[in-house]
Swiss-Prot record:
GO terms for molecular function: nutrient reservoir activity. It comes from the Eukaryota. Disulfide bonds: none annotated. Belongs to the zein family. It comes from Zea mays. The alpha zeins of 19 kDa and 22 kDa account for 70% of the total zein fraction. They are encoded by a large multigene family. This is 22 kDa alpha-zein 14. InterPro entries: Maize_Zein_Storage, Zein.
Amino acid sequence: MATKILSLLALLALFASATNASIIPQCSLAPSSIIPQFLPPVTSMAFEHPAVQAYRLQQAIAASVLQQPIAQLQQQSLAHLTIQTIATQQQQQQFLPALSHLAMVNPVAYLQQQLLASNPLALANVVANQQQQQLQQFLPALSQLAMVNPAAYLQQQQLLSSSPLAVANAPTYLQQELLQQIVPALTQLAVANPVAYLQQLLPFNQLTMSNSVAYLQQRQQLLNPLAVANPLVAAFLQQQQLLPYNRFSLMNPVLSRQQPIVGGAIF
């Protein structure tokens, strides 16, 4: 009897627990991608594996360490470029008055000067670049001499390499050589036709057309703008002042051309 009563009580207890019980789903059956959407970041990090957390921390530290030197190098390069820009602007401001004056007087030379910074020779040796710029002014005359008289051009090139003056100061030497080439032609023109010679020197002078003798007397007292602009003409005019006292220049132009040129001494 007692066993039957105990079995009945056990069945009643099981029935009562079955009616009051609720079904609880297991968390392991839910997908892991849904959990971080409903939990805060700190809670989701707590569910990660410790190895994953250590890996993420290591990656963050490595990224911060690698980015810091790159940022420092970029700042140093920017600072260096800024210093170079400031120095270049200061140098340009020093040369602005001279360049502005050069642009008004000679635009072609000003444009050549603007290319100075892009010329490797100018950056390495400014003096050599200036001599090269001066030599380029005489290239057309030398090219014309090479076409008209190749032998004279070759002789001049040989003298250019052997003359101490040509080695020390090539532009001055070329000016003297060109003066020696121009003076005979102008002297011959002055002896053959003084009026045409004076017209060639000063085409806008009316006194030259009307009275050449009066002009020859007056040119020793007045300033010649062409002589100021062209040193070759200035040297030739100084030489022509000795023309009335030179018998060979009036009697024999060939002997006059063989005499030493006085105008070359001013260089």
